[in-house]
């Protein structure tokens, strides 16, 4: 997911998306630990998605404080 796509979404949608990605990240970590995860690159993609979402949310919080 691109940061430009995330910036178009509402804050509530971003928070829900963050929750979903965190759940997915947890499930992938459990699969990796049990040896069931075949595509380990998925873990990195989800981690970067979480970082992008958090970045956009923090940008909005900073903008609110400055306004």
Swiss-Prot record:
SUPFAM superfamilies: Ribosomal protein L29 (L29p). The keyword Ribonucleoprotein applies. Pfam families: Ribosomal_L29. Keywords: Ribonucleoprotein, Ribosomal protein. It comes from the Bacteria. GO terms for molecular function: structural constituent of ribosome. HAMAP family: Ribosomal_uL29. Belongs to the universal ribosomal protein uL29 family. This is Large ribosomal subunit protein uL29. The gene is rpmC.
